[in-house]
């Protein structure tokens, strides 16, 4: 139903990106090779493994295009009251400039909605 990817790096699976940013791992191995069609969630991108190497826009571009559907946004390591609005702005900007397709986001929405229906979870 759901799987969580971490920010760990395994150069046997992807020589360039950690799991949470890797299209090769998430879309290639997990979805295509293993046939997983559920929701992929990733750990908090504000964790140092990501935030020390990527800015908000780059990290969300990579995660979404890799196939991540849902994010843990803890915002507790270096609390920023504007973190969530910055993430939303970054994603909107990435869609506007064509770096993330609307269809990619719709795919995630469909998977999340399907999971919510399966477990009778309501809300918007």
Residue ranges of predicted features:
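Second-shell residues forming the walls of enzyme active-site clefts
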Residues: 1-93, 97-100
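Mid-to-C-terminal alpha-helical segments outside catalytic/metal-binding sites
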Residues: 96-124
């Amino acid at each position: 139903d759901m799987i969580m990817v971490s920010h760990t790096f395994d150069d046997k699976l992807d020589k360039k990106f950690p799991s949470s940013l890797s299209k090769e791992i998430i879309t290639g191995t997990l979805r295509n090779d293993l046939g997983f069609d559920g929701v992929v969630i990733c750990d908090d991108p504000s964790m140092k493994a990501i935030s020390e190497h990527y800015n908000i826009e780059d990290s969300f571009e990579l995660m979404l295009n890799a196939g991540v559907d849902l994010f843990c946004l803890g915002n507790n390591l270096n609390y920023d009251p504007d973190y969530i609005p910055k993430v939303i702005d970054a994603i909107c900007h990435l869609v506007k400039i064509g770096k993330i397709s609307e269809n990619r986001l719709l795919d995630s929405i469909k998977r999340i909605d399907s999971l919510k229906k399966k477990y009778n979870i309501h809300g918007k």
